[in-house]
Amino acid sequence: MARQQGLRKALAEKFDDELKFFKGWIDKPKAVGSIVPTSSIAARRMASVVNPDSGLPVLEVGPGTGVVTRAILARGVKPENLYLVEYSEDFVRHLRAQFPGVNVIHGNAFDLDATLGDKRGMVFDSVVSGVPLLNFPVSQRIAYIEDLLNRIPPGRPIMQLTYGPLSPVPAGRGDYKVEHFDFVLRNIPPTQLWVYRRPVAS
């Protein structure tokens, strides 16, 4: 009986997350890239690049309802060492309720100095991004990735998901390397994962 109740609760929470995500997509389709949250399988792959033992905090941009956030915490990152930047006020309220202790910041991912405020000079271990970059001009995508790379050590990754077949940030347009990380079929829609890094000086 307890197991059935637990299953019903888990299904209800998943359905609630999907409703929140769909509402966010209806309200702000440019800021929300899909009508359903990222799958737990894609979330674990995205979180796999995070190094919880680096001693540095982790930045997640565009966390939505927190599926990837949960995977990052499961990697061993302490809540106080995880910073989330989310544009939707509804998602911000949800994230603060779901993840007490995590630093949830409401603001624009394309203006991180203003959004991070007194944390603008913080150096992060890595960045996990769910921002729907294909909804923005290429020049803005490049500037976004370059800005994030300025906030992590050389060689450390930015993990970015996208629903298009190609990297949303083209190679050869800035001081970064592009790596195709994975294609996750078990996601709606199927998603491509890309990694961006600054080369380590030899």
Q: Would you name each region that the model predicts?
A:
Residues 88:
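Conserved SAM/SAH-binding beta-strand->alpha-helix loop
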Residues 142-154:
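A short glycine-rich, Lys/Arg-flanked "PGG" loop and its adjoining helix->strand segment in the class I
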Residues 14-52:
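Class I SAM-dependent methyltransferase Rossmann-like catalytic core
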Residues 65-77:
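Conserved SAM-binding loop of SAM-dependent methyltransferases across substrates and taxa
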